[in-house]
């Protein structure tokens, strides 16, 4: 792209703002053992501190730090950052003095390589558990923290949004073979090949997501589970069905009664120490540490008859079983990389225009198009509160509603009594979608909603899927009207429903005030 023909220093300045480089540093289970990885494992508070420090560096426009039990990855965008070493930054900010040896464990990627790698990470292709579910949430949370700290710029915001969308599309459309969906499931699956857990007494330390998943899997295998609970100041305590509970502080009392101990907390300190085990006459046979930083002091493996497992001992390469699926996921990745390149091209071209409105670097994903629904057949699958709200809105636009659900809310029943809607009692079947103009899936069952999506996609029917915005061909709007004006509100990505609802309410109040 040549600048000379434009004779504008301001355009060059705008281009410097818009065309930013991306650089990343990655440390994961492939390059570093767990004792190294835990040195670069950070609390949420520490992540925020690191992001603020990096954002303040010269040339840095944005920074996102992804930190999981199996990887630490730093993504930086900015101008003239090609010579920046993000691995060195992490070493310095982590207080590590042995920079030279540690930096060799990091993979440094620039621009297209960094973009492709992040896409693969989000889709689970780089995970220790291939195609794992949790990584999507972890990538999403990393971007959210950067957003809260104001360290994410539009380049990384767009990249992470597209990565998350690609990952959810891959998860929805590609079915894989015999792959555990989490570290917890993988650990229990691998251990059950060597040990029989039936009637074994198992202590699970940590009532987070991983701990609860372990409990669920072990109960299926016939184990007797005791799980620890902390005294939380906020939030609901979820106790897995079939588990006994004890306070976290009483875990030592249960150790001599346990055959197996599994620990999966976010504690910065050991939950099980050498001293705790040394004084026991009867020691648990198996210890499983699913935390990073590690929960269980590694020296307990020195005791006779004690086996200690950590995350690195559960790696299994499932990619051989799923080569076709991996290829399909990479096709999805390439599609979203093209979307990102399209967005970058838009920014570059917008920098040359004199029209101020085009200097906005947001490329909207959906166009808000109002269509005539008068007499058009619309299928609504579901009979709950969400379906009720959808039907009430659609009726105001003259749609011919066909409803399929095993049960109806009282409001929907009243609409049926008044012959405002057509109704078939029962569960959704593919034939229900025949000759429909639009389809709304609003059940509380993911499998049903996904089936509606697949059927609608096959027949080329526009669909709104209440529990999965990635499966929506259109987002169902919040409607407002006053003084002859009818409008619909959605967020750019189809999420943030509470904000959309709040804004719509404010607009309605303004309309009422002007009446």
Swiss-Prot record:
Pathway where this protein functions: Cofactor biosynthesis; adenosylcobalamin biosynthesis; sirohydrochlorin from precorrin-2: step 1/1; Porphyrin-containing compound metabolism; siroheme biosynthesis; siroheme from sirohydrochlorin: step 1/1; Porphyrin-containing compound metabolism; siroheme biosynthesis; sirohydrochlorin from precorrin-2: step 1/1; Porphyrin-containing compound metabolism; protoporphyrin-IX biosynthesis; 5-aminolevulinate from L-glutamyl-tRNA(Glu): step 1/2
Oxidoreductase in keyword set: yes
Region feature Glutamyl-tRNA reductase, mapped onto this chain: 26-174
Keyword RNA-binding attributed: no
Keywords from the named record: Cobalamin biosynthesis, Lyase, Multifunctional enzyme, NAD, NADP, Oxidoreductase, Porphyrin biosynthesis
Residues at which L-glutamyl-tRNA(Glu) binds: 68-71, 127, 132, 138
GO BP annotations listed: cobalamin biosynthetic process; protoporphyrinogen IX biosynthetic process from glutamate; siroheme biosynthetic process
Subunit-level organization: Homodimer.
Function: Multifunctional enzyme that catalyzes the NADPH-dependent reduction of glutamyl-tRNA(Glu) to glutamate 1-semialdehyde (GSA), the NAD-dependent ring dehydrogenation of precorrin-2 to sirohydrochlorin and finally, the ferrochelation of sirohydrochlorin to yield siroheme.
Entry protein name: Probable multifunctional siroheme biosynthesis protein HemA
Organism listed in the record: Ruminiclostridium josui (Clostridium josui)
Gene name per UniProt: hemA
């Amino acid at each position: 792209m040549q600048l000379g023909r434009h004779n504008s220093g301001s355009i060059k300045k705008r281009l410097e703002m818009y065309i930013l480089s991306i650089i990343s540093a990655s440390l994961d289970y492939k390059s570093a053992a767990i004792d190294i990885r835990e040195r670069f494992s950070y609390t949420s508070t520490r992540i925020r501190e690191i992001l603020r420090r990096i954002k303040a560096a010269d040339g840095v426009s944005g920074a996102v730090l992804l930190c999981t039990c199996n990887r630490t990855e730093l993504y930086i965008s900015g101008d003239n950052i090609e010579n920046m070493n993000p691995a060195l930054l992490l070493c310095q900010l982590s207080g590590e003095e042995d920079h030279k040896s540690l930096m060799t464990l990091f993979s440094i990627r620039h621009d297209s390589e960094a973009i492709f790698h992040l896409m693969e990470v989000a889709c689970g292709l780089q995970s220790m558990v291939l195609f794992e579910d949790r990584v999507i949430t972890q990538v999403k949370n990393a971007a959210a923290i950067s957003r809260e700290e104001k360290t994410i710029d539009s380049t990384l915001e767009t990249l992470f949004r597209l990565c998350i969308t690609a990952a959810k599309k891959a998860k929805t459309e590609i079915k894989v073979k015999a792959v555990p969906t989490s570290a917890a499931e993988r650990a229990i699956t691998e251990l059950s090949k060597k040990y029989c857990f039936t009637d074994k007494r198992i202590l699970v330390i940590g009532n987070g997501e991983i701990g609860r998943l372990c409990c669920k899997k072990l109960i299926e295998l016939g184990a007797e589970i005791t799980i620890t609970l902390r005294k939380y100041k906020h939030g609901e305590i979820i106790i897995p069905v079939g588990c006994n509970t004890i306070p976290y502080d009483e875990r030592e009392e249960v150790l001599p009664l346990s055959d197996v101990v599994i620990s999966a907390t976010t504690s910065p300190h050991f939950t099980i120490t050498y001293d705790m085990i040394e004084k026991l006459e009867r020691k648990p046979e198996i210890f499983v540490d699913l935390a990073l930083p590690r929960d269980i002091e590694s020296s307990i493996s020195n005791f006779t008859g004690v086996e200690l497992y950590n995350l690195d001992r559960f790696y299994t390469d499932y990619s051989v079983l799923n080569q076709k699926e991996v290829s399909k996921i990479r096709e999805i990745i390439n599609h979203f990389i093209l979307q990102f390149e399209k967005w970058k091209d838009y920014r570059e071209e917008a920098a040359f225009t004199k029209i101020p409105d085009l200097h906005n670097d947001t490329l909207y994903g959906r166009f808000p198009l109002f269509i005539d629904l008068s007499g058009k057949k619309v299928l609504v699958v579901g009979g709950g509160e969400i379906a009720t709200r959808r039907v009430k809105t659609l009726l105001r636009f003259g749609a011919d509603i066909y409803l399929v659900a095993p049960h109806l809310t009282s409001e929907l029943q009243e609409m049926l009594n008044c012959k405002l809607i057509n109704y078939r009692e029962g569960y959704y079947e593919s034939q229900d979608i025949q000759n429909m103009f639009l389809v709304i899936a609003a059940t509380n069952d993911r499998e049903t909603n996904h089936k509606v999506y697949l059927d609608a996609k096959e027949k080329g029917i526009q669909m709104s899927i209440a529990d999965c915005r990635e499966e929506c061909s259109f987002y169902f709007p919040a409607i407002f009207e006053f003084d002859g004006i009818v409008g619909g509100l959605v967020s750019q990505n189809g999420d943030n429903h509470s904000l959309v609802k709040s804004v719509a309410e404010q607009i309605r109040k303004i309309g009422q005030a002007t009446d």
